[in-house]
Amino acid sequence: MYTMKKGKDMAKEEQETAAIEPLSPVSQLFVSPSLYCFIIFTLGFQTRCNPSTIVEGVKNTWIKLPRFSSKVEIKKNGKASWVPVSVRVEDHVVVPDLDYSNIENPDQFIEDYTSKLANTPMDMSRPLWELHLLNIKTSNAESLAIGKFHHSLGDGMSLISLLLASSRKTSDPDALPTTAATRKHASSNKKSWWLVGRFWFMIRIIFTTVVELFKYLLTLCFMRDTKTPLMGKTGDAIRSRKVIHRIVSFDDVKLVKNNMDMKVNDVLLGMTQAGLSRYLSRKYDEDMVVEKKKNLEKIRLRGTVFVNLRADTKLEDLANMMAKGSKCRWGNFVGVIIFPLWVRSEDDPLEYVRRAKSTMDIKKLSIESLICYGLIKLTRKILGGKVVETLVRRLFDHTTLTFSNVMGPDEDISFFDHPMSYVAASALGGPQALIIHYVTYVNKIVINLAVDTSVIRDPHLLCDDLVESLDIIKLAAMEKGVHKMEV
């Protein structure tokens, strides 16, 4: 049985959260019409799906959370609040009546089903989540659960924690999944150099933050990315969304990480830069635009990267995450940084990873994401929500794509007694034509693309370029490792 807290403790918490609660500043942005954001996720199972078991599990976990049993009510002044309502789980868990025997290509069917779900508006008059269960065998799973959550419910860390709270170890059905904690800003300075090192570190943080905030201001005012086949027009609404994913080996990413002494995020950003470079180079070849290909290295192409602002990124038990004072806060506690992408042809594929690490090291010295989060709250309080929406909209209008990486479970888990094979997820919304998400699960990493098909008509080709770029980078890293051993 999957439960959270019981008895008096649970009753007390329900009383405390039963009142109407205002949305957080970031959640307010996600419900605005111009930045309407939601998350599409897919859980692949190793067995056939039992809908009644999942419905019972949802009743014992998800519905205990105030946000999953509340609707969003927007007042005339634009302020939104969570309003508790009674929830019938069966209305949110959908089991479509399909003739699976007539489905010739299950993988294509799931892709179309997911994309259709992404293009269907959510019913704002009820809690903003739904879960679709399909007993269809694909190349990577025996059955699937496809969910759609409004982004106001929580960020990637919150929803991964919800997944873990709904799961148990496959090796030990009574044990909750565990993951390693990631501490930030650990210091190894010796005491004798502590003051000098600390002072110099603070100077670097202040200088880097000022520079990055100045670039942020320029972007909000007028600095826009170069027009490329990846970028939509300013002010355009997304016409039609398509969601696709591809599963690759996480071990390949770890091999590059270890051989180059990098972080996983550095490798993923490096392969993204390499993949985008390949895609744009081919596009300019096809269009016979010689001048544009020559100027490929002069392109300004930037991504908005969501940064988790929690001090401790351990995926804690969901009940602890909801508790006041928890180190790991539930909800949308994220900041946004602007990440310049290295887009050009390189003879050495490892240069893409080195450039990614170099840029990320600078970003790690800056606290722009935390300051911007605070400025959103302050601006909303002083000038109102419309001003914040306009500024954030301009940020996404003036950049090309969004990138994020979410570390999932590092061991096999069962979701309400269903052993899982993979997790895929994409956040959609806003004016950008391309959103790239990476989600890890044990020894797999899932590349997720959400695109505006009126701008990017061949998302599978772009996905191929990302996969091939990882292969090329891996081979180069292996060769580098061999040279190191010889030396």
Swiss-Prot record:
A single Gene Ontology CC annotation of this entry is: plasma membrane
Query: What is the top-level taxon of the source organism?
Result: Eukaryota
Lumenal topological domain ranges are 215-487
Subcellular localization(s) per the UniProt record: Cell membrane; Endoplasmic reticulum membrane
Q: InterPro entries from the xrefs?
A: CAT-like_dom_sf, O-acyltransferase_WSD1-like, O-acyltransferase_WSD1_C, O-acyltransferase_WSD1_N
User: How does the record say this protein sits in the membrane?
Assistant: Single-pass membrane protein
Which reaction is the catalytic activity of this chain?
an acyl-CoA + a 1,2-diacyl-sn-glycerol = a triacyl-sn-glycerol + CoA; a long chain fatty alcohol + a fatty acyl-CoA = a wax ester + CoA
Q: What class of enzyme is it?
A: transferase
Active-site residues per Swiss-Prot or TrEMBL entry = H151
Q: What is its main location?
A: membrane
Record-level Gene Ontology MF annotations: diacylglycerol O-acyltransferase activity; long-chain-alcohol O-fatty-acyltransferase activity
Q: In which pathway does it act?
A: Glycerolipid metabolism; triacylglycerol biosynthesis; Lipid metabolism
TM spans (from-to): 194-214
Spell out the Pfam families in the cross-references.
WS_DGAT_C, WS_DGAT_cat
Please indicate the ranges of residues that lie on the Cytoplasmic side. 1-193
Q: Does the keyword Manganese apply?
A: no
Q: In which tissues is it expressed?
A: Mostly expressed in flowers and siliques.
Q: Which GO terms describe its biological process?
A: triglyceride biosynthetic process
Q: Give the keywords, sorted.
A: Acyltransferase, Cell membrane, Endoplasmic reticulum, Membrane, Transferase, Transmembrane, Transmembrane helix
User: Which interval of the chain is the signal sequence?
Assistant: none
Q: What is its EC number?
A: 2.3.1.20, 2.3.1.75
The record's similarity note reads: In the N-terminal section; belongs to the long-chain O-acyltransferase family.
Q: What does this protein do?
A: Bifunctional wax ester synthase/diacylglycerol acyltransferase. Involved in cuticular wax biosynthesis.
Protein's name according to its UniProt entry: Wax ester synthase/diacylglycerol acyltransferase 3
Look up and give the organism this protein is from.
Answer: Arabidopsis thaliana
